[in-house]
Every structure is written in C-alpha cells, then in structure tokens.
Regions:
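Asp-based, Mg2+/Mn2+-dependent phosphohydrolase catalytic module
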Residues: 1-11, 126-159, 163-190, 202, ...
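Alpha-helical substrate-recognition element adjacent to the catalytic core
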Residues: 2-107, 153, 162-253
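Short His-Asn-centered micro-motif
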Residues: 76-78, 122-125, 226-229, 272-275
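Short, structured coil segments at secondary-structure junctions
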Residues: 94-97, 116-117, 135-136, 244-247, ...
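Conserved acidic residues
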Residues: 99, 119, 157, 249, ...
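Short acidic-hydrophobic, aromatic-tinged amphipathic segments that line or gate anion-handling sites
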Residues: 100-105, 123, 140-141, 251-255, ...
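Short hydrophobic/charged patches on amphipathic alpha-helices used for structural packing
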Residues: 110-111, 260
C-alpha cells in the first residue's frame, strides 16, 4: 500500500516563509541563481534563523506527539535541490520533523499542491499564492519582515482571520466598495439570517477544527475573527459561522480601527487578511500574510 497523507492537516510552505533567507535572497536578486546556490552550499552546515511562519509550523507539528500523525508539513520551494539541503538541515537543527520537500529551481511549485491535497500554502511569492488560490487552495503571501510570534503561549496554536474575502466571500465587501458604509450596514442587517458564502479560508478553519477535536494533552488551537465589521453587521458573520458548525474563540468587531495593536494583544502565530493595508499594519506586531482574493485584489 502506498503512503497517504489522507486525514492529516497538510501545510505546504516555501523555504523563505519557514526560515530567514533574506540575506541570501538579496544576493539572488542582485546576481543570479548560481551565486545564490554557492552561498547556500557554503552555509549548508549553518542553520538558518527561524522565519515568519516558523512558530506556526513548529506548534502545528507538536500535534504529532501521539502515535498517529495529524499534521504534515512539506517544503514547496523555488529553491534548487542543492539549496534544499540547507533547508532540511535547518529543520533538523530545530527539531522539526519535516521529511518531504519539492524544489523547482525557479519554476513555480504551486502545481504540486494538488497531489499533496494541501490545506494551506504559505509563500513569499505573490504569483504562486494567486495560482494556489485560483486552484481553491487556502494560500497567503508571507510578509518576510513581519514581527515574529510571541513565545507566551507554547501550548497553543493561535491563528487570527479576517472575515470578508478570507473566511467569507467578498459579497458584502463589494457592497461597501460600491455604495459605502451605510449601504453595507443596511445590506448586512437585512441579510443577518442568511449565511454568507464561503471564502477561500473556510476549508482551513474546518481542518483546524477537526485537528482541535483530536486528543492532544499538550496542544490546543485558539482562533480569532478580527474584522472591520461592527454592529449591526456583526450578526451575519456570527450566524454564518454557526451555520457552518464552526466555533471560534474570540471575535473582534473593530469598526474600522487599525487591527495591529489588537492583534499584538491576541499574540497569534499567524494572521490572514485580504487587504494589504491591514497586513502592513499588522506585520509591525505579529506574523502576517496577505490573501490575494476578492474585490480588493483584482
């Protein structure tokens, strides 16, 4: 029987999202891939520093402490295979049990998400992220200069999500951008009992809820909805989650307030939002990734 990842939460991640390869990337952009490969080979025994998504990956892999594996992390990288050696060695140095990887030397690796049945793709490459989202894979462009995750919650995976165009469709956001706040509030008040259509990250939230149900005395998941919505538009968001039989732990209806300082207090391992302004504000405080979906991302 072939090995299968069925039933596991599968996270595909680029090497630059997992580890801090910013210095090496600057050399690549200034020269070529061969100079980059030489530098990575020279540093093959030097563990790379943790990157923006390191804490998220490290904590998710902790769900595998029991006999049955629940989480699989796969490197999906534009790096060359030689540079891939340093990625695997860095993972081993930090005790990350990562065994699988695909290295494509400059080619887009997103097409390998399908045979992996990936639940999430994290990359610093916007084109790859957009391709993944077009293929219905939850994906985000990691901001490599984001603040690193807090170490205050070692036994919790903390993930924060925007609502419209991330967990939910962009239906309401389109009304807001076309007709303004008053029309948006009226639209949502009139449809409070009608669930919103799913957004690109609903499948990930469902997968996280399934993972939370697995017996794990060491780890738990804590989720937050962090949205620019405010009352009365809050009700449709809550009722939509109820209709999906999904529970979240915290909800912040901020009515247009900047999200960054609220996220700083929540201390997530990662935050997902569809608007670059929100991500840039958040990235000063927490690890953040841009979801290039919906009307704000033509």
């Amino acid at each position: 029987m072939p090995v299968t990842l069925a039933g596991q939460l599968v996270v595909a991640i680029s090497s630059r999202a997992l580890f801090d390869f910013e210095e090496e990337n600057r050399l690549f952009e200034a020269t070529d891939d061969r100079a980059y490969m030489r530098l990575q080979l020279e540093r093959v025994d030097e563990p790379a520093k943790p990157g923006v998504a390191f804490s998220l990956v490290n904590k998710l892999l902790a769900f595998n402490a029991g006999e049955a594996p629940h989480v699989e992390v796969v490197i999906l990288s534009r790096n060359d295979p030689v540079s891939g050696m340093r990625v695997f060695r860095s993972a081993k140095h930090y005790g990350l049990p990562i065994q699988r990887g695909v290295f494509t030397r400059g080619e887009s690796p997103w097409r390998y998400l399908r045979p992996l049945s990936a639940n999430l793709f994290l990359s610093t490459n916007e084109a790859d992220v957009r391709s993944a989202l077009a293929a219905d894979v939850p994906a985000a462009r990691v901001y490599p200069h984001s603040a690193r995750a807090s170490s205050a919650h070692p036994n919790e995976v903390r993930i924060a999500f925007d609502g419209d165009a991330v967990l939910f469709s962009d239906e309401a956001e389109r009304v807001y951008q076309r007709a303004g706040l008053d029309a948006f509030q009226a639209h949502e008040r009139e449809r409070a009992a009608k669930p919103l259509a799913p957004g690109p990250f609903k499948p990930l939230l469902e997968a996280l809820q399934r993972l939370q149900m697995e017996p794990s005395p060491e780890m738990r998941i804590r989720t937050a909805l962090v949205t620019a919505r405010s009352a009365p538009a809050h009700e449709r968001a809550i009722r939509t989650l109820m209709d999906w039989h999904i529970e979240i732990d915290e909800a912040m209806f901020l009515g247009g307030l900047a999200k960054g300082e609220f996220l700083r207090e929540f201390e997530p391992d990662f935050f997902f939002d569809d608007q670059t302004g929100h991500i840039e504000n958040a990235a000063a405080h927490v690890p953040a990734g841009h979801v290039a979906s919906g009307v704000s991302n033509p």
